[in-house]
Amino acid sequence: MSVAGIILRPWYRFASKVFATWARPTVQPEIPAELLAGNDAPVCYVLEHGGLADTLALERQCQIHGLPSPLADLQFAGIAESGQNVVLRRKRGFILRRPSTKGSKRLERLVDASIAAGGKELLLIPVAIYWGRSPDKQHAWFKLLFTENWDVAGRTRKFFATIFQGRNTLLRFSDPLPLSSIVQDGLKPEVAYRKVSRILRVHFRQRRIATVGPDLSHRRTLVNVVMHDPGVRAAIDAEAGDSRTKLERTTQKARKYAQEIAAHISYPTVRVVERFLGWVWNRIYDGIEMSHVDRLHEIARDHEIVYAPCHRSHFDYLLLSYIVYHQGLSLPHVAAGINLNMPFIGAILRRGGAFYLRRSFKGNRLYAAVFSAYLRQILVRGHSIEYFVEGGRSRTGRLLAPKGGMLAMTVGSYISEPRLPVVFVPVYFGYEKLIEGDSFISELGGAQKQKESLFGLIRSVKSLRENFGKVYVNIGEPIPLEPLLDAANPEWRTSASYEQERPPWVGDVIDELGDAIMGGINAAAAVTPISLLAYALLATPKQSMGELELHRQLALSVKLLSRFRYSESVTLPDMSPRDIVDHGEKLQVIKRTAHPLGDVVSMSEHEAVLMTYFRNNVQHLFAIPASIACCFIQGRRLEHSELQRLIRLIYPFMQAELRLKWDFDDIDDVTTDAIEALLEQKILTRQGKFLVRPSAGSAPAFQLLMMGQSMVPMLQRFYLAIALLVTNGSGILTRAKLESLCMNSAQRLAMIYGLHSPDFFDKALFHDFIRTLRARNVVRRNDAGFLEFDDDIQRIGEDARLVLGEEIRHSILSLTFSGPGFDRL
């Protein structure tokens, strides 16, 4: 060890502890020592720019996490270095600091030694340190002071950055790069050194883009770029015609559109909002549980990310951006409905990354051109994007049909200018209570949707006094765009310009992509304690159950979902049935009533209505085993093949409503797997070729009955639509008339039988069912617009006898007028 090292090393270590009193960076990964698990090769840290602050921060975190010190001597391949760190880019000059054109001499010596020693192993660990996180602004007159951007900070600026941004700093350890795998046999030392340096430079650039985002254009500059887009100019010319006066007015209109749309990210605003949101989350939620976040880190460095979450609450916008920012990734640009562009609030959201879009572009070619050009610029510059493929918030807890508008513009922008590969990331939000719950129920009951306003937001502040449980955020499996394009048209990179006319095959890609995103969201579902309680209690007539029976039903649900696993991305609660009940009681969604023979757990009528939302969140996970259980409500035994036939019959309609992932051709095998899962739980038994329900009155029989009841409302809706078709006759009803009849009949049925589920008469569900009937060619639309069908449709009604009780079937039929075929249903 050198004399300087003996003197300076203790000072460095002391200084790092003092420095840590105000500089406390967020470290990623949370346990960096795992990067070196099972590897005892010597380590050398690589810093991009270096400096005293970076060295002290790295030294302190290495002490905390038990990693080799960057200040320790490095003995490698016969050479000795006075530190286990390399600075890739230094500045020269004492007063006027300029980037040095020379590389790292230490790195050069290490590469030479590795080659001389026949490729001896050394682990290079890139360490990126960002003092404050905001990207640079292209062509801006000044940069945000003391925040991390694309400029190499000078000493004075770095000093103040550590003072003011010490606790808004990210220190990221990347995966080790084995030097031997980079330095191949036969490379000359100078060539090998240049190769290693280039790989590290590219790595740091990609990491910076993933963390702070690409350079931000000033909003005015970006608007000007949009205004010069060929598509926008063509739309202006088409609307203005030959009139010079109209050309000026149309140009101004286009500019106003661009200004209405464009985000204006302000990192000082982001930091203020981040602290405010942290306070809000801590006040109303018991925590935010995240799963599979590692998927984001795997793709962020070299992909353009389009976040595609389900839409359950207005908080979705804020939650995902908050989580992404806290994961050390660049803040996404979020597509927000123009209804959120309220006074004051809209400006804050815009500075947090929101760009606004109108609900419909129909008939406004100019607006569509401006929006498309803006989106293209965001993609081309490498910004991550977030939008809701469903379009609006789900009022029922089920996924809505994907809307193709934003997908079409994203795909079109990428085809026009493919840069970084685009991946779509499905994101699942699982809430335990919703702030908008009551308004959703009112809207499903027929009330008009309330318009967002500042006063409405102020009124909702009272919600901050309530406890909304936990929020679960699951990251789905990323969906790359290029394989879909390659499968649809291998020549898409050299085809005619997308700007001229959208090729027909692109529509198929958009449909496939939308379905894949919805499937990815469902596959990443979070099963929450509240959704399990809702699933169990809503299956009972009075939404109540003995506590012991409820414990058994909850345990069955968890075991069944573990055995019949919808997807490896689905997460289950790590709680006992007793803990789940206690949790529900704490959130006041259930109440426990003491009784000498055993406590009874129940939901109030109001809570039962709200809890249908959370049951629907997870209904797709239970759909197949619950449908099998449903077949045993009216009968005690069925052949295996008959069960498969019944599931085949209803599967296309269940698939459309619940966005189930299995292909129709595979459903027999899926049914068999679900049967085996039920047999393992001993709520079904096998007798030869028959499957048999347990003895009436037994606990397993009760469990099977409760599971089957969860699917009955869906089957009742299907049967109601068929009954209305048959009783009115072929060629009598239009699609719109049938939908209206279905909704009104279901609403009356719910009133008579006290069905606490407003989604039972949701018009959108009947719309999807009728659309599936048409897609399966069960019904057809004639030239006059009326629905026609054959006698085959009556088979569905006849099979309903096996599932639906006689009382409910007659109640449904009593709501319809007698007509041809009435007596056969």
Model-derived regions: residue spans:
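Membrane-interfacial terminal anchoring regions of lipid-handling membrane enzymes
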Residues: 1-825
